[in-house]
A protein has these predicted regions:
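N-terminal glycine-rich phosphate-binding loop for ADP-containing cofactors
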Residues: 1-238
């Protein structure tokens, strides 16, 4: 965090999120710095995994949580989690809405399309989907309407996408192509360097040759690609 604080301009919104947290400072002073030290928000002991008490920074038994909401969100998408009115849904909204708003505010300052930001978060921080891909999953209108209901500022690039999305599949004379939204409402085909094909993008423009509950088979330029979508990529009789 401090490295970003040092390099970002003073007017960058990140500074609002980077204020020093006294609890975190105390954890660092205590040596509770993560896995390398064996101490962080969790600690492994002879009695099993322990969790940090956020009040006095001591450790105690880690209770088994009810994961029904998370399991349904995994099946139905992140929007299911954000629509939950409980503490988990509210926490997810507070964290994710700030992150996605910040990403949207960076267009066009750091680039004229969402692709670079999405790639940076996926390749650099191991996100499964980038911020703008998540916004499409959540629903741009749902996201904007909730921000406005909370009297929060809505980034210009996000407002421009109202009633639409940040990515779309467009049909032309050459077939289907994946496009991204640019500032001003224009659309541009996503181009990768020669020899680079991303299946997550290509999959949106083609149909599987065959599919079942556990896997799908695609013909990708005469290359057979099998995508597993079962738990632990397990095969069954199908």
């Amino acid at each position: 965090v401090q490295s970003l604080v040092n390099i970002l301009p003073s007017e960058d919104a990140f500074h609002q999120e980077a204020a020093r947290i006294s609890m975190m400072s105390q954890m660092i002073e205590n040596g509770q710095t993560g896995n390398k030290k064996g101490l962080g928000f969790y600690r492994n002991s002879d009695d099993g995994r322990e969790v940090l008490d956020l009040i006095d920074l001591s450790y105690g038994p880690a209770p088994r949580l009810n994961l029904t909401l998370a399991e349904k969100a995994e099946q139905q998408g992140v929007k299911h989690l954000l629509k939950d009115n409980g503490v988990y849904g509210q926490f997810a909204w507070r964290v994710l809405s700030r992150s996605l708003c910040y990403a949207a505010s960076l267009i066009p300052e750091v680039g004229d399309s969402p692709v670079g930001i999405d790639d940076a978060m996926k390749l650099g921080y191991n996100w499964i989907k980038g911020p703008f891909e998540l916004l499409d999953d959540i629903g741009v209108d749902f996201f904007i309407n909730r921000l406005e209901a909370e009297n929060r500022a809505v980034p210009t690039f996000l407002l421009e996408a109202r009633g639409s999305s940040f990515y779309r599949v467009h049909h032309n004379d050459h077939g289907n192509e994946l496009q991204c939204r640019l500032i001003g409402g224009q659309w541009q085909a996503i181009q990768r360097d020669e020899g680079i094909v991303r299946f997550t993008e290509k999959r949106q423009t083609i149909q599987p040759i065959n599919t079942c509950a556990v896997a799908s088979w695609y013909d990708l330029d005469n290359i057979a690609v099998v995508e597993f979508h079962s738990k632990a990529n397990a095969l069954d009789a199908e």
